[in-house]
Structures are given as C-alpha cells and as structure tokens.
Regions:
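Short Gly/aromatic-enriched secondary-structure transition segments
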Residues: 21, 85-89, 134-146
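Residue-level recognition of short, solvent-exposed, well-ordered loop/turn junctions
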Residues: 63, 117-119, 226, 250-251
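Structural signature of FAD isoalloxazine-binding scaffolds in flavoprotein oxidoreductases
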Residues: 86-103, 118, 250-260
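A generic local secondary-structure boundary/capping motif
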Residues: 4, 58-60, 81-83, 107-116, ...
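Catalytic-pocket segment enriched in acidic/His residues
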Residues: 51, 78, 154-286
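Short, structured patches in soluble enzyme cores that scaffold and shape functional sites
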Residues: 7, 95, 111, 120-122, ...
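N-terminal non-catalytic cap/leader segment that marks the start of a structured domain
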Residues: 1-90, 256, 273-277, 282-286
C-alpha cells in the first residue's frame, strides 16, 4: 500500500491511499494524523472522495513529524569516500519539521551558504509507539518508507563538530512522494540521485551499516518513538563535497531522488527571497 498527503485548493490537506493514478481519501488530514489515529490497516479499505493524482500538489508525506532523527555515515561506500572507519554505533542528529518540503516543492537556497550538497536517503516512518524495542517490536513499528534528500549546507555543517547547523535549514529537505509499505519495495531496490539529469548516486538501499530495524531499536532506547516520527537512514557515496573538485547545487538546478518501489522527488533549487521572508516576519509582528 502507498499513502500520500495532498494539498487541496482550499488550503487544507488530506491523506489518500494511492490506487494507480487516483488518491482515495482515508478520512484523515495527513498521513501523520492517519498513523497517530492507528488508521494504517483501515486505510487499505478506505472509500472516501477520489482525486486525480496527475499533477496533484503533494505535501511532505508526513508534514509535521514529532521527531525527525537523521543518521550520518551509514552507507559503507560513503564512509569510505569520506575517509572514515566503519562505526560501532550510529551517528545521530535532528531536523525540525520546518525543514521539510514536498516531493515537487522548491528547495530554498539561502544566501548565507554557497556549498549546498545532495544526500539521497531512505526514510523510515514509524507507525506505532515504541520504547526500548526488541528486533521484532522494531520491525512491527515501521509503518513504511519514503524518499528523502538531506540537502546539506556543508560550509555551515563543518563550522563545528556538531553537524546540526548545516542540516536543519528551513525548506531544504524534500520527503515523499508517498509512504510505501515494505511489500511495495523490491529486495534489490536502488536509490538514485541526479542533478540536472546527471546520475551522481546509485546504491542498493540494503548497503546500510545499520538497517531500519537496527535504527528503531537503537533510537528507541534513548527516547520513545511515536507514530509519524521519521528516521532518515543516511546517504550513500557520491556526494558533491567528496568529489575532486567538489561540486554543489546552484539555483536553477533540478535535484531528482528516486527509490525503486517508492517513487521520485523532483525539486528545483531556487534562491531564497530574504526580503520576502523579512516582510512576512514584519507583517506577523504588526
């Protein structure tokens, strides 16, 4: 089964089950709300209003996760290209919901950074509440998977040993296009990242040092994971910063991220209009 969150013309969002080119409303405002209501199984039989998905405006599949936990250095080839040893434990950092954008939304390029890199990733979406999960509990807690690109401001990331400040910029991180349950994803699924059509990353998603179950177990030891929480599992080799010479994303370029069985993100990078943001802030304070 595949689920998506649609933006409708009247400003509201709805969760839909994807039936071919049609989205069937499940009775929830978004996929996160569906999961929090325990509606994953019921979504398979939902028979609500129908929407044509051709050209539909897709929101982040989970628009406002309670937690977004990201994993660094989790693909063997990426660890080696960055000159590091395989880790004993996962490296964790976080994002806020304000970082997330939809699968066709524009990536905002801030004027404060000129070293903006791509990091295609598999995202895990949690479906049930777990704490200190066993392997079986961790597997059962996974509602499904999405595509994510952890677009990174490298010049900010390396200002300190903590990566967070390069990873959490607003309107930088596409996620979607759907939540796909595990049965939708082939065992040999590949993650591919392209910039303006040029292939830059291609890796089997099972090349993870710590797989999805490992991560749910480890993270749930630290704190409770709840329905709708997102875990970004890390990026494979092929990032721009590790290339000789280094390469980065510029305004006007199109970043495409694909995982077999889940779908594709297509996001154009645009220069952030700081004047517009400032004006909005002034209006809110008036």
């Amino acid at each position: 089964m595949k689920l998506a969150t649609l933006r409708l013309s009247e400003g509201r969002t709805v969760a839909v089950r994807v039936d071919g080119e049609t989205g069937v409303e499940t009775g929830h405002t978004d996929v996160g709300a569906l999961l929090r209501a325990g509606g994953l199984e019921a979504a398979a039989a939902a028979d609500g209003a129908r929407h044509d998905l051709a050209g539909a405006d897709l929101a982040p599949v989970v628009p406002a996760p309670g937690k977004i936990v990201c994993v660094g250095l989790n693909y063997r080839n990426h660890i080696l290209e960055m000159g590091r040893e395989l880790p004993e434990y996962p490296t964790l950092f976080t994002k806020f919901p304000e970082a997330l954008i939809g699968p066709r939304d524009e990536i905002q390029i801030p004027p404060e950074s000129d070293k903006i890199d791509w990091e295609g990733e598999l995202a895990v979406v949690v479906g049930t509440t777990v704490r200190r999960a066993s392997a079986a509990e961790a597997e059962a807690a996974i509602a499904g998977y999405a595509v994510l690109n952890d677009v990174t401001m490298r010049d900010w990331q390396y200002r300190s040993p903590q990566w967070f400040q390069g990873k959490a910029w607003e309107n930088s991180t596409p996620i979607g296009p759907v939540l796909a349950t595990a049965d939708e994803i082939p065992g040999d699924a590949q993650m591919v990242t392209r910039l303006d059509g040029e292939e830059l990353q291609r890796t089997p998603i099972d090349d993870l040092v710590f797989n999805a179950v490992d991560l749910v177990r480890y993270i749930s030891t630290i704190f409770t994971l709840n329905p709708g929480d997102v875990i970004a599992t890390g990026t494979p080799g092929g990032v721009g910063h590790a290339r000789k010479p280094a390469r980065y994303i510029s305004a006007g370029q199109t970043l495409t991220t694909t995982i077999d069985g889940i779908g594709e993100l297509v996001n154009v990078a645009v220069a952030e209009r700081v004047d517009a943001v400032a004006a909005a802030g002034e209006a809110a304070r008036a």
